[in-house]
């Protein structure tokens, strides 16, 4: 694996010179191998090690290099044709392969090669980009987008129209992460490497980036780039120091544990916020 990483790191340093026409065989094979390992879930761009999320930057670099070494090609779809550098994940799947993998894909859901989809996942008409990791039991609802290299945990619900930001465009240092057992409400956006920690509930229409203030109304504390575990979050505003205007923020209205979440439905958690 170290040899593979060294090839990727070296090639990335001269990425501006690389084109589909001049990419050498060693680099091409290394990049293709990494994409295949990401596709199978054997490797992932970010993983939790000793309680901390660690981003493997060299894997992200391999994803970026794949756009340098591959030319656009015609890609067949069920109702249409496409012209892109990245093949579709399910292009060669037959019924036996789908049965073996154990997830559902509802047309016209689109998943790029290099994204991993775990068992018991349901993909409604949605989009999952290259390098993403979607873990077991997760629902990616209609028109939701899982951005490049984003990490989605187990038993997560991404509601209709949710956007989970990627790392490729614009280029971000770390992927956006949604940990296990989270609920992200319809049309919400979580981007720029924000981490939503385990068991959190994000209401409909909440937008969180690295500069978004995440205000805990019980403690008065303000977080940036991280939603603490078990938070129930709604959109809100905080007043300016001079009181003349207010600016958007996300508000943590309560904290819940797994026991409470097991007894109370998501809608009930969001209704009782007073």
Swiss-Prot record:
Activity regulation note: Inhibited by N-ethylmaleimide, p-chloromercuriphenyl sulfonate, cobalt and copper ions.
Subunit text: Was originally thought to be a homodimer, but is rather a homotrimer as shown in orthologs.
E.C. number: 2.3.1.117
SUPFAM superfamilies reported for this sequence: Trimeric LpxA-like enzymes
Protein name, entry field: 2,3,4,5-tetrahydropyridine-2,6-dicarboxylate N-succinyltransferase
Primary localization: cytoplasm
Family according to the record: Belongs to the transferase hexapeptide repeat family.
Gene Ontology CC annotations of this record: cytosol
Gene of this entry: dapD
GO annotation, biological process: diaminopimelate biosynthetic process; lysine biosynthetic process; lysine biosynthetic process via diaminopimelate
Protein's job: Catalyzes the formation of N-succinyl-2-amino-6-oxo-L-pimelate from succinyl-CoA and tetrahydrodipicolinate, a key step in lysine biosynthesis via diaminopimelate pathway.
Pathways involved: Amino-acid biosynthesis; L-lysine biosynthesis via DAP pathway; LL-2,6-diaminopimelate from (S)-tetrahydrodipicolinate (succinylase route): step 1/3
KW Cell cycle (keyword) present: no
InterPro entries for this protein: DapD_Trfase_Hexpep_rpt_fam, Hexapep, Hexapep_transf_CS, THP_succinylTrfase_dom1, THP_succinylTrfase_N_sf, Trimer_LpxA-like_sf
GO MF annotations, alphabetized: 2,3,4,5-tetrahydropyridine-2,6-dicarboxylate N-succinyltransferase activity; nucleotidyltransferase activity
Pfam entry (one): THDPS_N_2
Domain of life, per lineage: Bacteria
Reactions that this protein is recorded to catalyse: (S)-2,3,4,5-tetrahydrodipicolinate + succinyl-CoA + H2O = (S)-2-succinylamino-6-oxoheptanedioate + CoA
Binding site for substrate: 104, 141
Compartment annotation: Cytoplasm
């Amino acid at each position: 694996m170290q040899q593979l990483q060294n090839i990727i790191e070296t090639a990335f340093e001269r990425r501006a010179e690389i084109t589909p026409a001049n990419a050498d065989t060693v680099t091409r094979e290394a990049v293709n191998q990494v994409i295949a390992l990401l596709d199978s879930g054997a490797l992932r761009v970010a993983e939790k090690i000793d309680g901390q999320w660690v981003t493997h930057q060299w894997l992200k670099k391999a994803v970026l290099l794949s756009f340098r070494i591959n030319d656009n090609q015609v890609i067949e779809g069920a109702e249409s044709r496409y012209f892109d550098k990245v093949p579709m994940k399910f292009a060669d799947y037959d019924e036996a392969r789908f049965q073996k993998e154990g997830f559902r894909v509802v047309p016209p859901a689109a998943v790029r090669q290099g994204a991993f989809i775990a068992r018991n996942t349901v993909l409604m008409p949605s989009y999952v980009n290259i390098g993403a990791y979607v873990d077991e039991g997760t629902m990616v609802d209609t028109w939701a987008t899982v951005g490049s290299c984003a990490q989605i945990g187990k038993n997560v619900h991404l509601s209709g129209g949710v956007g989970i930001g990627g790392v490729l465009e614009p280029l971000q240092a770390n992927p956006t992460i949604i940990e296990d057992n989270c609920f992200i409400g319809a049309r919400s956006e979580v981007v720029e490497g924000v981490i939503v920690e385990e068991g959190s509930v994000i209401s409909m229409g909440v937008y969180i980036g690295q500069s978004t203030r995440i205000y805990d109304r019980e403690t008065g504390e303000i977080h940036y780039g991280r939603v603490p575990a078990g938070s129930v979050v709604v959109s809100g505003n905080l007043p300016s120091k001079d009181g003349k205007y207010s600016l958007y923020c996300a508000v943590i209205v309560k904290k819940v544990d797994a026991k409470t979440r097991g007894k109370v439905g998501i809608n009930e958690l969001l209704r009782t916020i007073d």
